Amino acid sequence: MVNYRMIELFIKTYIQMGILEMKKRIFALLLSASMLFALTGCGEDSELEIYRKEVESFYADVIEINDNINAIDAESENAPQKLLNELDSLNERFQEFGELEVPEEYIAVESLADEAASFMNEAVSLYHSSFSEGTFNDFSVGMAYEKYCRAILRINYIGDILQGKTLEGENINIHYEDEEE
């Protein structure tokens, strides 16, 4: 018999690590993005203003889903299903975020959002397969967590870009528009 409560706690811990890192950046991101978009936007319905609202909504929804995950009673018989439902909601928001129209000024964000959506979709699929048929597959959980971390990393990169920061790190290549190829 699989101990789903322990598995659910294990998965929640990994998910919280990624979300907590993202939560640290959200306030600064929203403040910076609001100020940046306010300075560059020229009307209430400008493309930048619409995008800003969508980004804020996305981050607020991610925080709410994280809070829902944290509120799951690990002793509950249906805890694994509740966790998977919340992960499905998270995946849905990532997919919607990946489909957003990105303003020209932030076109670099578009591919990152698409990658984040793809990685989150793979992660949630692997989390579901980890619980399939009453068995637990720790390899699938490990792979799911890796995909999850990649999705969160790209969301963090998006936050940095919207704050005007220059991305740094391994495997990051920056190409400027005025460079000749």
Q: PLM features: what roles do these ranges have?
A:
Residues 43-45:
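Bacterial signal peptide processing site
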Residues 1-21:
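Short, Lys/Arg-enriched N-terminal segments with co-localized hydrophobic residues
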Residues 24-32:
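Sec-dependent signal peptide recognition
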Residues 47-180:
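Alpha-helical segments in soluble extracytoplasmic regions
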Residues 38-41:
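C-terminal motif of bacterial Sec signal peptides marking the signal peptidase cleavage site
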Residues 21-22, 151:
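Short alpha-helical segments used as structural interaction elements across diverse proteins
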Residues 10-13, 29-30, 170:
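Intrinsically disordered, low-complexity segments enriched in polar/charged small residues
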